[in-house]
Amino acid sequence: MTDLKLAAQRALNLMDLTTLNDDDTDQKVIDLCRKAKSPAGLTAAVCIYPRFIPIARKTLREIGAADVRIATVTNFPHGNDDIEIAVAETRAAVAYGADEVDVVFPYRAFMAGNEQVGFDLVKACKEACGSQALLKVIIETGELKEEALIRRASEISIDAGADFIKTSTGKVPVNATPEAARIMMEVIKAKNPKVGFKPAGGVKDAAVAGQYLAMAEEILGKDWVSARTFRFGASSLLASLLATLGHGDKPANTSGY
């Protein structure tokens, strides 16, 4: 297997296959779940809005893909600073049966100088997840922009109990970048290597995925990269990976994520 194919296979098994669109329907989520059971193996998870968790769970069981985890989003996509709402949404997501919750850090309040609300929101949402769900914190690096802000938001999220830190919602102009990824993984190495990392948005093909995997191995070691500590948030990436692996043609890109 070539290096590119190896990267494609690894990336596929580390993917949170995502649909987070305003026009999502039960049928679109059913189709997404079927894609998660790909000709080259299972994706790590699907990532969907909370109301679709029951239909996703049912579909994954029916197709023999119950090992695919179900991730959802809260405080999404704007990262508001209302802790009560974020916690209520997170509790509801866990009650629906989410295995993982991707919560948006209150990045605008943080950029305005309020570090405490970020810590408190992440801590409260982690408590709401209990032992039932992993908490991934989206810090929205494309809006933070500055290295110092990306570093500090990563530190606060980890200190507050995040299981993963994630670059982006996919809903702003700039999503995952190698520069932001390096900063975030350096913080993970310094603070707690048990915390995972998820680049989201802008990872379009096996070559780009391979660059992120190589960076993760360089910073945190070859044994660190697994579905427990590394995910790709993506939608259009799957078709490209399957094409690289010899399964069908690469269709047109239909999503910015």
From Swiss-Prot:
The keyword Signal does not apply. The active site is at 102 (proton donor/acceptor), 166 (schiff-base intermediate with acetaldehyde), 198 (proton donor/acceptor). Pathway: Carbohydrate degradation; 2-deoxy-D-ribose 1-phosphate degradation; D-glyceraldehyde 3-phosphate and acetaldehyde from 2-deoxy-alpha-D-ribose 1-phosphate: step 2/2. Transmembrane segments: none annotated. Pfam families: DeoC (PF01791). SMART domains: DeoC (SM01133). PANTHER family: DEOXYRIBOSE-PHOSPHATE ALDOLASE. This is Deoxyribose-phosphate aldolase. It comes from Aeromonas hydrophila subsp. hydrophila (strain ATCC 7966 / DSM 30187 / BCRC 13018 / CCUG 14551 / JCM 1027 / KCTC 2358 / NCIMB 9240 / NCTC 8049). The lineage of its organism: Bacteria, Pseudomonadati, Pseudomonadota, Gammaproteobacteria, Aeromonadales.
